[in-house]
Amino acid sequence: MPSSPTSTRKQTNFTASVSAQSRKSISFGNPKSTGGKGYAGANQSKIVASRTMTFLPEMKPAEKLNIASAKLVQVLDPRGVDVTPRPLYHPDPHAMPTKPSKLLTSQEGSMGSDYISSYSLYQNTLNPSMLGQYTRSVIGSSSTVSKSSISTTESMTEDLEDPSYKRDRLASFADVRVMRAPAEAAITKEELERNVEIFLMETETLRFFDLPTVMISTDSEEAEKVIEKNINYEILCRNRLGNDLYVERMMQTFNGAPKNKDVQCDKIIMEEKGVMATTWDLYDSFNIPEASLAAKRSAYLSKASLLVRDRDPKIQDSESSSLMDIESVILAKSHEDEEDNSEKILKSDKLHQDLFYMERVLMENVFQPKLAAYRQLPIYKELEPGQPEEDLQVVNKVTEDEVKKDEEEEMETELEIEITTEQSTIPANLERLWSFSCDLTKGLNVSSLSWNKANSDLLAVGYGNFGFKEQKRGMACCWSIKNPMWPERIYQSPYGVTSVDFSISSPNLLAVGYHNGTVAIYNVQSNHNTPVLDSSESPQKHLGPVWQVQWIEQDRGTTGDDRREILVSISADGRISKWVIRKGLDCHDLMHLKRTTVTSSKKGIEKEKKGEALISRQAPGMCFAFHTKDTNIYLAGTEEGLIHKCSCSYNEQYLETYRGHKGPVYKVTWNPFCPDVFLSCSADWGVMIWHQDNVKPFFTFYPTTYVVYDVAWSPKSAYIFAAANENRVEIWDLQISTLDPLIVNVANPGIKFTTVLFAKQTDCLLVGDSDGQVAVYELRNMPTPTESGRGDVINVLLGPKAN
């Protein structure tokens, strides 16, 4: 292949050896050829062009110094100071800046084949795909190598061999200051193994509200698609009903596990307020302001009557509105004064006392027939309204009957005989009058009843459970016959009340025994709920439930005129104690109940029967009863089923022991007419009548298979007593029968009778149950007591056994 022409300015042989000068060539040839250098174009004529370009060697150091020593242009001011402007651009001395050349520009405004030859400077072969968009212009420029291409090659050689470019580059090296990065220190092995602490901190949580819209404007591009989609959905819903293409299927979804959260808030305080307006309040509030307003209005109108006709109607309207404002101000002031007075009135003690008596009057009107039957008074029927003439006729007839009273005396005697015969045919029964109960006593067990010694209309009731595991809150209430709907006094306690009793010498004192062993004394005259005295801090307090408390008057001297009152209590800890009121409650033990061994007689020889070892030497006490005449003697019932006769003078031994019951003795009471006879009941379902001179019972009654909780003698007959079983109340009359009770009253399902008590002055019986109710029953058609001595009658009934 012939060599390409070289530049005319420098006649340098391009084929010289490599050691003489550095050579770089750009050749175009067939890429498949291994010996030659060339380029295969995309032209159909397959014209091959070969060029060889030679670059000048690098400049010598002497030339560099000459170029650097060349002084640049300096600007001096009149004083001779160098004010030459500093260059804004400082090129990197280590970077090889691109030489401004004409490689990428064509002489004729378009790129030719010479550009392609320079592009393959460091490549032996060039793929046509690398030419890109320039392939078309290069191939389509000409099919043969023209003179213009030769001239272009010559210009390229001039640009490559132009020493001015290198001089400019060396000159820029002298003015540029290079800042090199400091060399990084080598990391040792210890530094690599060192623990590095990394602290992770939570960034602030940013919340962005994003609510995608569900509406699209009708002018938007998506409006047509949305409208079409909605129309298709409506058509789908219409075609779904009755279509065979749709089938209903059941799906099961998983609900997330619920999470409970506790929220605590302040206590909400509720207050109830009531307002009462009576007719006279309304009358005063409307009439008094109107009178004052009328006087002021008349005075005001009299002064302005001369100018009314000449005034504008607007002025008249303003005057009427001002009068209305004055009236409203006066009414508001009067209401404020009434509110201030009403608060004082509602908080006054006088109002509370008046309301207390008013409530009693209303209750007596409501319960008038029942109260009349309780007091054994005639019952008056209410007169029907609208018949005053008939009432007057009745009154006149009553007066006429009183005049003819003498004439009818003989007739009355005959009628009495007939009435007695009729009463003998009608059996005795119980009629319920009312019950003492309220919301506070609902569900509580009535444990004890006691009448006030001075006021027979006042009744004390204790509420508490007998079982140890059934303990709830306790309460002691004072009820009055005049108000059966709400108690007069309420003494609440966290412990159950087991016994209550009023004092004899001081009727205002109420003794209360609790299940925790405390004995408390309340003053019923005051409204305070705190006890006057109690044994909660006494070192000698009971350690078990106090099953009974009773006030006893004991003789001090031999004559019996001087008496003092003591409070006696019996507890499950086996102690019978007396309490004396001094500065506090002083306790003294009357008896320590001890367990006794069972003895049996065989062939006249008494032998002690061996029993099991006793867990406790103390016998729990359940009840006691002091003799009606000799207050130094008393009976004590125990949990063993024994009844001990004790004396206040001996506290170590018993006077007598009565054996008959097989279970705990719940109640012992003396006959009020025969002081030697007493009555007892037990958990062994039995009721027994005893004589104090005989250790065996005279009568034993086992009418049912239920526990007998309480018994009581009648205050009007020595033969009659009442017993409270679990499911019924029995009235016994020993004069009529000793086998069957005279009256039986069965309890409601789920209710147990617990206590009984006779009224003092009337033929009524009070029965307490397990639901917190104290029912009052009237004894009707009871047999009249005999006229003979009642004390002798019971002795005659007992027969020779009592002697």
From Swiss-Prot:
Domain of life per record: Eukaryota
Biased composition range(s): Polar residues: 1-33
InterPro entries the record matches: Dynein_IC, WD40/YVTN_repeat-like_dom_sf, WD40_repeat_dom_sf, WD40_rpt
Gene Ontology MF, one: dynein heavy chain binding
Keyword Protein transport in annotation: no
GO biological process, one term: axonemal dynein complex assembly
Keyword tags: Cell projection, Cilium, Cytoplasm, Cytoskeleton, Flagellum, Repeat, WD repeat
Ranges occupied by WD repeats: 492-532, 541-589, 616-656, 660-700, 703-742, 748-787
SUPFAM superfamilies registered for this protein in UniProt: WD40 repeat-like
PROSITE patterns noted in UniProt: WD_REPEATS_2, WD_REPEATS_REGION
GO CC aspect terms: axonemal dynein complex; axoneme; dynein axonemal particle; motile cilium
Localization: Cytoplasm, Cytoskeleton, Flagellum axoneme; Cytoplasm, Cytoskeleton, Cilium axoneme; Dynein axonemal particle
Compositional bias annotation for Low complexity: 143-155
Disordered: annotated span: 1-41, 88-109, 143-163
Keyword Repeat carried by entry: yes
Subunit and interaction comment: Part of the multisubunit axonemal dynein complex formed at least of two heavy chains and a number of intermediate and light chains. Associated with axonemal dynein subunits such as, DNAH2, DNAI3, and DYNLT1. Interacts with DYNLT1.
Function, as annotated: Plays a critical role in the assembly of axonemal dynein complex, thereby playing a role in ciliary motility.
Protein name: Dynein axonemal intermediate chain 4
Species this protein is from: Rattus norvegicus
Gene (UniProt): Dnai4
